[in-house]
Amino acid sequence: MPTTYPNVAYGNVKKLETQTILFKNATVWTNEKEGILEQTDVLVKNGKIAAIGKNISDASATVVDAKGKHLTSGIIDEHSHIAISNGVNEGGHNSSAEVTIQDVVNSEDINIYRDLAGGVTTSQLLHGSANPIGGRSAIVKWKWGASADEMLYKNQILNI
């Protein structure tokens, strides 16, 4: 059986690599003062937006005809309990502020893939409600096939 990324039954045989993708003629929802931009191109390099505008070209890009399609920024889920291994609740104490979700992020949870498919790119993972003061949260940027350490935001403030 081949190694997969993540190494579970629904992983990819080949580790996914970032690509340069050019979306042509999309309706772009900026969620900013610019509003909705019709027939607009979006160039994505190394997983980040590199350019937004008209008539963008890049010889190295895979071109996607996005006419009639809508693009928006990734959704941020500010209250999630997915991808947590046996650590959602620490019910034995009134306060579990000494523990952190960062220690129990499960990068192999299929719900990461489902979140990404639904447009959720970033989540705050929280403890459950078993005690008055829960443990510290973790903020993650979902990347299917990446390790937990690769998904955790670096130098984040640990919130309760």
What is each stretch, according to the model?
Residues 66-160:
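Divalent-metal coordination cores built from histidine and acidic residues
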Residues 11-13, 31-35:
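Short loop/turn motifs at secondary-structure junctions and domain boundaries
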Residues 19, 24, 38-40, 121, ...:
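Envelope-exposed proteins and targeting segments
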Residues 28-33, 125-128:
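Short beta-turn/strand-loop junction motif enriched in small, turn-promoting residues
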Residues 34-72:
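Histidine-rich, glycine-flanked metal-binding segment
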Residues 1-25, 53-56, 67, 80:
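Extracellular/periplasmic ectodomains of large secreted or surface enzymes and adhesion receptors
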Residues 25-26, 47:
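Solvent-exposed loop/turn tips at the surfaces of repeat/solenoid architectures
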